[in-house]
Amino acid sequence: VYKRQGYVPYDVKINENTARTLEYAYDDWCIYQMAKALNRPKKELKLFADRAMNYKNVFDKESLLMRGRNKDGQFQAPFSPLKWGDAFTEGNSWHYSWSVFHDPQGLIDLMGGEKVFVEMLDSVFIVPPLFDDSYYGQVIHEIREMTVMNMGNYAHGNQPIPVSYTHLRAHETSAH
C-alpha cells in the first residue's frame, strides 16, 4: 500500500500509519544515500529519492502538522494533535511533525517559511501538556514523562525537536 499510495493509509487497519510513513520516507532517504555511494543506476537512485519525499503526503496544510490520511486521500477525522498512539508510535502529531530529519528545508517550506516554522516549533513548548490517551486506554510512561517535565507538549523521547531550531541557525534557542 505504501508504494502505491505514497503513504500508509489510516483506514486500512495498520497501526501507527503516519509514524510508519515518516519512518519509511527517512529509510528511503538512507537507502538513496547508500545507493548513491555505491554508484547504483540513476533509475534506482530516483526511486528512493522520490520516495524519501513521501513525508509530504501526510502533511496537513491546514493544521501545519503531520496527520493520518485515509486511502481515498482525505485526512482522518476527527483529528486531535494531542492524541497519543493511533496514527503515531508512543507520541502524537505535535511530536512526529518534526520527523523529517533528511529534508528540514522541505518541512520549513511546507509550513510556509522560517517564521511559521519557528512559531510552530515554539508552540510545542508553549501549549499545555495536555493529552488524549484513549488509544492506549491508560497513561503510558512517555505521557507521564511529558507531563512531569512541564515543557508544553514536548516529550523528551523525541529529542530532535529542540535541535530543529538549528536548521534556522537559532542555536541559542536550541540550547535552552
What do the predicted segments below correspond to?
Residues K115-E119, R169, S174:
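Alpha-helical multipass membrane-protein architecture
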